[in-house]
Design a protein with these regions (language model features):
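Catalytic cores of alpha/beta
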Residues: 97-102, 163-173, 219-232
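Conserved anion-binding
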Residues: 113-189
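Active-site mouth loops of central-metabolism enzymes
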Residues: 21-37, 55-60, 82-98, 121, ...
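Conserved N-terminal beta1-alpha1 strand-loop-helix module at the mouth
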Residues: 1-69
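Active-site-adjacent beta->alpha loops and helix N-cap segments on the catalytic face
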Residues: 12-15, 36, 60-73, 91-100, ...
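Generic structural signal for hydrophobic
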Residues: 41-45, 74, 105-106, 135, ...
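Hydrophobic faces of well-ordered beta-strands that scaffold small-molecule active sites
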Residues: 23-29, 49-54, 79-85, 114-116, ...
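C-terminal alpha-helical cap/extension of soluble enzyme domains
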Residues: 4-15, 203-275
Length: 275
């Protein structure tokens, strides 16, 4: 879609890459919105959303027409569509033929990105890697979701093997993952703030080109921290209700005090905003 002139252009703000972006991606969770709600969200925020995620079990209880219409609407606003890993995990438990039928329907819908994970299922790593390669071969971009915990409470203690975590993420990339998504549960989600495992996030960030990693960061203090530590072009996965605040934080115009008037980007001399 053609870009419209912004209001108050006399006020400078941090530049961001134009779509299609190679970094600073925003992956937004859709919680089952209808068409009118989705269009209202896209009308105000589509420029800041790179991929809309159809999440959890929700697409299974919605009509095929609604899902198809939502995908068409996203395309109209230059937003790609991804699908969370829950349905794929259920398909895995129901056998190879269900997996085959499910992946075929994902492709037929025109869904471009699919989370591949083993959050709920117990599956050997080589099988996960084979699944990533299969999804890629079907022309779907596999987003390998990797985490340290699933279904915990804030008061539960967990053991984090960060070397194993980083190793798994690297193997997922080698198998053909488009990017790896670091699940927040056990790191910042379901943790008291004093127990955040930002040390683990830091080890992941240091082990990868940041363009290859997506960080789940639903809470404002978490994504503000990531922007402060890794810059405004870090890839982030948030709820769609966070989009406007997140984009303002990326541009240094909103957010907690560490970000205000401190955020900057640099794309070289006279090269524009694409790279």
């Amino acid at each position: 879609m053609a870009k419209e002139q912004k209001a108050f252009e006399c006020i400078r703000m941090v530049e961001r890459q134009d779509k299609p972006r190679t970094s600073g991606l925003t992956y937004a969770r859709d919680l089952g919105m209808g068409l009118r709600s989705l269009e209202a969200e896209l009308e105000s925020s589509a420029e800041f959303i790179d991929i809309l995620k159809l999440t959890s079990f929700v697409p299974r209880i919605q009509s095929k027409k609604l899902i198809s219409d939502k995908i068409k609407l996203c395309r109209k606003y230059d937003v790609e569509v991804g699908l969370g890993g829950a349905l794929l995990e259920i398909a895995l438990l129901q056998g190879p033929q269900t997996v085959k039928a499910f992946l075929g329907e994902v492709r037929d819908f025109g869904i471009t990105h699919l989370e591949v994970c083993r959050q709920a299922v117990i599956m050997p790593l080589p099988h996960l890697l084979e699944l990533i390669a299969l999804v890629k071969d079907m022309g779907i971009l596999p987003l390998a979701e990797v985490g340290v915990a699933y279904g915990i409470t804030a008061d539960e203690e967990i053991y984090v093997d960060d070397a194993k975590l980083v190793g798994t993420m690297k193997k997922c990339m080698e198998a053909g993952a488009w990017k790896v998504l670091l699940e927040s549960e056990g790191l910042t989600e379901s943790r008291h703030k004093k127990d955040y495992r930002c040390d683990v996030v830091s080890k992941v960030a240091n082990a990868f080109n940041l363009d290859d990693v997506m960080f789940e960061a639903d809470d404002r203090d978490v994504y503000t921290r990531y922007i402060t530590q890794y810059g405004p072009e870090v890839n982030l996965f948030v709820d769609y209700t966070r989009i406007t605040h997140l984009e303002c934080t990326r541009r240094g115009g909103w957010g907690k005090h560490p970000v205000i008037n401190r955020v900057a980007t640099f794309y070289g001399f006279g090269k524009g905003k694409k790279r």
